[in-house]
Amino acid sequence: GYRRGIPENYCMAFIPGRFMKGELKEPEDRLAFAAKLLTDDLANSQSLSKYVVLAHERRLGVPIMEWDERLLYLKNASLRTPDKGVFARNLQLTRLIHGTLCFGESLYQDNITEAKRLNAKDFSLPGVDVMLPNRIREVADAYYEGLLGWVNAQ
């Protein structure tokens, strides 16, 4: 069945890290880990992610997740970074992509208000025949603003 809507709503971002027991058994996993340590990828990913979550909070009005022990993927599989809302986690995406990476969670789609906004048909793109949720455009704008902020800070 479907889950009930929830009142909580947060944004956060994940960067490479938080390897757990058994996750470095294979040579390719150890190589990916070494590549992260020997490059600026981790520092750049953390910095980019900080700008992205700040832009999400500003543009979307979604608060930044600081920490929640009830969220097992944070408690058991993530590490906090010094930047609010940025967590290190060993996801396949964060492990195998080389370079600067921000895996963002822009909002909780289970949030009652967000679910309605994500289902609204209140935006159109030139040349596209169907109406789309404006909230998707707003999320894209937040990523764009965060990326520009990070680039301008370099």
Q: What kind of region is each of these model predictions?
A:
Residues 2-40, 114-127:
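A short, glycine/acidic-enriched catalytic loop
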Residues 37-81:
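Acidic, glycine-rich loop-and-strand cores that form catalytic or ligand-binding grooves
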Residues 10-11, 45-53, 140, 144:
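Extracytoplasmic/secreted envelope proteins and their assembly/folding machinery
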Residues 34-43, 146-151:
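Noncatalytic linker/hinge segments flanking ATPase motor cores
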Residues 25-32, 46, 133-142:
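Short C-terminal domain-edge/linker segments immediately following a structured domain
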Residues 3-5, 64-154:
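Active-site-adjacent mobile loop/cap segments within catalytic or ligand-binding domains
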